[in-house]
Structures are given as C-alpha cells and as structure tokens.
Curated annotation (Swiss-Prot):
Keywords: Metal-binding, Molybdenum, Oxidoreductase, Periplasm, Signal. This is Dimethyl sulfoxide/trimethylamine N-oxide reductase. It comes from Cereibacter sphaeroides. The keyword Metal-binding applies. Binds 1 molybdenum-bis(molybdopterin guanine dinucleotide) (Mo-bis-MGD) cofactor per subunit. Disruption phenotype: Disruption of dmsA results in the inability to use DMSO or TMAO as the terminal electron acceptor in anaerobic respiration and in greatly diminished in vitro DMSOR activity. Residues 1-42 form the signal peptide.
Amino acid sequence: MTKLSGQELHAELSRRAFLSYTAAVGALGLCGTSLLAQGARAEGLANGEVMSGCHWGVFKARVENGRAVAFEPWDKDPAPSHQLPGVLDSIYSPTRIKYPMVRREFLEKGVNADRSTRGNGDFVRVTWDEALDLVARELKRVQESYGPTGTFGGSYGWKSPGRLHNCQVLMRRALNLAGGFVNSSGDYSTAAAQIIMPHVMGTLEVYEQQTAWPVVVENTDLMVFWAADPMKTNEIGWVIPDHGAYAGMKALKEKGTRVICINPVRTETADYFGADVVSPRPQTDVALMLGMAHTLYSEDLHDKDFLENCTTGFDLFAAYLTGESDGTPKTAEWAAEICGLPAEQIRELARSFVAGRTMLAAGWSIQRMHHGEQAHWMLVTLASMIGQIGLPGGGFGLSYHYSNGGSPTSDGPALGGISDGGKAVEGAAWLSESGATSIPCARVVDMLLNPGGEFQFNGATATYPDVKLAYWAGGNPFAHHQDRNRMLKAWEKLETFIVQDFQWTATARHADIVLPATTSYERNDIESVGDYSNRAILAMKKVVDPLYEARSDYDIFAALAERLGKGAEFTEGRDEMGWISSFYEAAVKQAEFKNVAMPSFEDFWSEGIVEFPITEGANFVRYADFREDPLFNPLGTPSGLIEIYSKNIEKMGYDDCPAHPTWMEPAERLGGAGAKYPLHVVASHPKSRLHSQLNGTSLRDLYAVAGHEPCLINPADAAARGIADGDVLRVFNDRGQILVGAKVSDAVMPGAIQIYEGGWYDPLDPSEEGTLDKYGDVNVLSLDVGTSKLAQGNCGQTILADVEKYAGAPVTVTVFDTPKGA
C-alpha cells in the first residue's frame, strides 16, 4: 500500500502548480495571437456542439443559431448534476448585468453621494470608457489620499472555474500593480478549522486528500457522516468536479456498510444509505464527543498505544475529561443534559465506534459556530482515542463532502494559472495573503466599523486598516456574510463600492459602479477536472459570444491596468490564448518528469480534454506513513505528533480558545442559559444552487415555496404555531426578519428549522433599518462575531429565532428582476 502522506500530496500538487506557472513564463515567451489561427475560436459557435465545464461538471453545449440551447453532461461523468439546466439558464437569466452602470447619485455627486441610498436600484447606463475611467480615477484618488490600505480587494467568493479568467486573482494582480491593497485571508467555509488544524495536525486538513474511496469501501465497517451531506454537496467543485465520490458512495452502499449520520436534519445522504440518524441539539457536538470520549476512557476502550506513540498532551486533556481539573466529569449523563440525547445512546455510539474499523467523516458546519475551533479538534481527539488514524478505512476525514474528496488522485500534472503578482502562497487561491496587509475575511464588517481598532488573530495583535474603497469581483458578500443589517450600516463607511459580475446580485445592487462580466461560457479558458483526483485537463471553450456589452474579466482588468499605466506589466504581452497555452505547456513539461504522455496544445484544444491514469492514488491511506513511524514521518506540528494539547495555543492565553478541546457555551443555543428565541436555524448548503450562484435562474422553480426560500419545520413546531405546508412565514430575531415558505416535515428535528444559505437579499424598503427581507436571506438572522480570537471565523450556524405565519401586506419579490434603468 502506498505510504504517501496528505501533507506530501498537497504540498506536491501546490508546488507543481506554482512551478507550472513559472516554467511557462520562462519557456514560452510571447505567444501572441498565433494560436488563435491554430484552432482556437475567437468567436462563439453558430451551430453545433462544444465541450466546456463549470462548478457542476464537464458538459457538452449544443448551440443553435448562436444561442446555447442545451448543456448535456459528459458521457464519462458518473453522477451528472441536476443543476446543469440552471447553469445554461444563467447565461440568459433576467438577472444578467447587460451594460456598465453607475448609481445615479454617485454619478452626480461622487464620494459626496448619500451612501444610505445604496440598494435603491437607481442606476444610469454609461459607456465602457466612462465606467473604466471612473474606476481608474477612484483607485488613483484613494491610493494618493490614503495609500494602499485605503483599498479593499479581499473580494471573497466562489467566482467561476478557469485558470486565466480567475477574477479575484486578476483583480489582485491589477491592484498590486496599482500600488497595493488590503487583502483577506481564510474563507467562510472553514475559517476556524483551517487555523486550529495546523496546530493540531500540522496541516489545513480541510482541503487535503482523504483516504481513497476504494480503500474505504474495502476496509471500513462503520462510516459516520458527522454534519456532512456528501450526496448533496459533492455535486459542486471548486474547479470542475469529476463526481468520483458518487462511485465510492455507490460501492459503499452496495457492500452494505453501516452508516450513521449525525445531524439535526435527515439528510439526502441518510436517505440514500438508509442510515441511522442521530440528532443532537445544534451546536452541542463537542459536548456529545466529550461524552463519548468519557465512555471510551472510563470503560478502558481507548487505544493507549496510539495515544502514547502518535499524540501529545492526552494526559492533560484526560484531567479535563474526568473532571480532575475543573470538577466536572464529562460523562454521558453530563453530555445528555446539553445535547438532548439519552446517555445510554451516547455510550452505545462510543462503543460502536471501536467495535470495528470506523471512519469519522465530518463536515464544516460544526466549526461555523461560536467557538467552532473546538469541534474538529475534539473530533481528532476522539479519533485518536479510537486509535485508527492511518489504518486503511479508519481515522477521520474533513473533506469527504467537499469537491469529491477521496476520489483517487491521478498521475497527471498539476495545472498552473495566472499569478496575482504578489507574495507567492502555496495552496488555494483564497488563502493568499498578497497585498499591503490582510484581515481574516469574515471580519470585513468589523474592519469597516472599527478602523484603527486592534484585534487578535492566531497569536498576533493586528490593527484594522481605514478602508475607503472596496472592489468585489466574483463574489456575493450580501449573501455569505452574517448579520445583514449590521453589514448595511458598515457599508456606508465606504466612499466607493465597485462590483464586477454577470448578474444583479444584492451585492451588485448595493454598488456605486457596476461592470458587466461575461459568464465563463462566453470566453475561452482551461481548468482541471477533479479537485482531488486531478482526473483531466479540460479546454473550457467559448460556447457563445458575449451577450450585451459584457467583457471577460481578463479584458476588463487589462483595460483598467492600461488606464493605471500598468497595461504591459499586466498582460506581459499575452492575449487570452497565449496565457492558456502557457499554462498547458507548463503542465506538459511537468508531465514529462512523471513519464505521463500529453498531446500538443493544438491537439489538446482540438480534442477538448486530456485524461490521466490513476495508479497509486487508488490505494492512498491518509497518515499511513505517520502511523507506521511517527519519528521518521512527523507531522508539521511543533512536536511532530497530533497535539491534543497545544503549548502554542496555551502561550496565546486566549479566554475563548483553551489549550485542549473544551466545551464552551456559544453566545446562543437551544437549551442554553438566557436563550431568547425558541428555534435554532440550521443554515444548510442548498441542494439546487452553489451558495448564492444560480438562485437567479429557473432552478428556483424546483424549491421555492410561495415564491420564497423554503423553510423546513417539524410538524410539532408547525402545529404549535398554526402553520401549514405552503404558508408564507416570517422568521425573526433581534437582528432582522425574513419571509420564507413553509415545508412541514419530520426530516428536521423539533426545535430546529432549516433555511438554505445563499438566498438573495431583497429588502422591502432599502432605506429602512431592519426592513423585512422579502425573499429569504438567512444571514439577515445570523450572528456576526468571530469564532474566537484564534481563528476569527464566521458564526453562520449560531442562530436562534422564532417563526410565525406572515400576517402583513402581500409583497412582491423583486430581486430576480433587473433594477430600473438597467
């Protein structure tokens, strides 16, 4: 069996991606436009079929008379996404941004415009030259008046796949050339875990390859999906998904492996496997794990050899577990009082985890909570007590639910992309810290409200910059950030807000300047297939010509860089196909070292895809080498071992993140002291969109209830409030109020309601503070505080609220129509 560690695999892929880019720059020189004459289309297809890809998979587009009429899944996709019709619809959706637009008051008064009127939809159409000149003037003004810390270019969001038209990298490239900017680090998905895990495991863990699915199928006796719904969430990928996880799950089901799903909602995954469903109160997972750990310890079921050889600090944690250090034993009975499960069920769960080979596959929602750092730290501690980390089919995994983690890695090369020109950072693009300074991404509102204020982050003290201008491309913060009404007040601190997108999201509607970008189906690009499998490299060929006056992200930023006097530095003399071919040729050079054959660029572009063989990747066992010899294969932690107790965190002295996994009361929870509202809001990932992407398409017809975002409510909670299926409901707390449509179902536990995150914010009266959101943006209700001083992640799952039948005047949802004048 291959002894390749997750760190080695991740580091090699990241290193190779960086080398791909640098080698391409050195080897190819200026490719210019010659490649366009060698098979690349400068224009969209008039009639016929063309292959391309998206966050939902590889597809073949059928074009008739210059219009895309169908997106059919690739015939080698084992589990095509049901969302492809919505992807097609996004090109022609009424939400398309057609022309460059400027908020009327900003056009007339500039930075003296009333900022509280943002979002009222009063825009004026301008020419591209007028829009780009205005953007360039604003960037220069802020740079000259405030320096690089006056411009925020963090621009977090899922954008679109493609190694050239990566709008966030391109934006950072332009802003770096313009003199610098304030960036953001981390992400909204895994902020707490990606800070705590390097202290515990020596790696981010959340974006690492998992033990391969074939190994899991062969060896795992019990699969536990803890706060994870991989049957739903693996439809999408950060790059182009291969959907390889579905083959693994199908094989696991066919084998009859026992599956447990721990979740307040009966998930699609639970239904698929016929799984046992365990539903603790939301936000009490750490208490449940502690009760299980106490059972293992008190019944002498823990693996003492693994703890002694592969971990450090268990004795200090055990003192807390038994109550020796604080007087409170974390027994199953203690846990039962907090999480609402019977004590005997907690004990039986613990015993079942050590009865055979067990894989703990955890999702990320349990760390998007107040004190979220504790959840995955405690999960690793529980897995360490079970003692199967590094064994085939055992241990834990934090990305089986994300981008098809566990899909076996191929022998192919890593594909590089365009650089932002700043500090070279290995790994995912959103983890970059290039720029004049950087803040944790979820603290953007704190930054705007507290310029010059100090904050703690991962052992360091930092100061919030005084930002005057924000530029957002490929993201929708008015969907993914918490506490919408607090955010709206903070946004008034900005003198200028620029948005570049292809659809009129709530974020675009609150902009001063709006630039229309193409969809990725109106330009050429190149991308990998399979975040973890690296199964293939795909030519993302242009399907149709750009609609209206939309321009590609590369062309927009190149034109902007030209106005800033940095055009040559931005383009380096390359056009679209020159860059794309350079990325491919760098991958070819890398493949030569691996004895992997690849066709010429011209043949590749003609064929549309090059696939790679899978050999050793099918046998990958995460942490096998570490388990075999921790001394010669140490982790990246200070001790080289799994740090159940972290001396580094101890030195930080944080009162909200102790040195070992600890149960800490969140700011609000069901059953918690002083809980003001009776229902927990489970803000789950949506089934038929990617966060907020595709909410403005025809896919909404699949799930909207009475024209609103659906709200799953238990029959008991519905009956107590006189609520019936299909009713329009008002969900409210002290932070805001939203309308949703009722779906009465026992799939959600009593005391909880489920509302998908990513619904587009649609204020009834944008000028009124705390106004009703007409459609159903769950982040109107969520709490905007950091998870702790350590990670400063978001707490998007820390929400208590109440619900009632809506008794107000009928409303019309307008967020899916274009603003007036647009």
